[in-house]
Amino acid sequence: MKIRVGHGYDVHRWGSDKPLILGGVEIEHHQGLVAHSDGDVVLHAVTDAVLGALALGDIGQHFPDTDERYAGADSAELLSHAVSLCQEKEFKTGNIDVTIVAQAPKMAPHIDDMRSSIAQCLKTCIDNVNVKATTTEKLGFVGREEGIACHAVVLMESF
């Protein structure tokens, strides 16, 4: 069995009137994230991790923000495309660990729904998906509530 590891990172700034979607879950908040797509910083980081694990580039190469076809795109569909590329290379998700870095809103009430959504996109069981959140103790752009960041690390296994 071959094992590959990928890391993804994404950031979006606050300032949109679009709904806030994180990990495929709509979260009530007074503003959304500015982005060409739906702005799901969590699924963008996960997509980059999956693509990176198999040396398939990054989300920007596959879905450029200069391409109007992806304006308002559902990030779950982008991740599903990345997963299909992995399946073509005969790899599946071993496990994934996600860290959301945000001062607000509180993520705890939404973690289980995010785990379920991510597991569905990755075609894996929820036990293979971990999502956690932290703040920056009011430091930096996240602490000033200018945006949200997300890290994702994925282990992919050959089948």
UniProtKB/Swiss-Prot annotation:
It comes from the Bacteria. Pathway: Isoprenoid biosynthesis; isopentenyl diphosphate biosynthesis via DXP pathway; isopentenyl diphosphate from 1-deoxy-D-xylulose 5-phosphate: step 4/6. Its EC number is 4.6.1.12. Keywords: Isoprene biosynthesis, Lyase, Metal-binding. One of its GO terms (biological process) is terpenoid biosynthetic process. It holds the Pfam family YgbB. HAMAP family: IspF (MF_00107). Homotrimer. This is 2-C-methyl-D-erythritol 2,4-cyclodiphosphate synthase. It comes from Idiomarina loihiensis (strain ATCC BAA-735 / DSM 15497 / L2-TR).
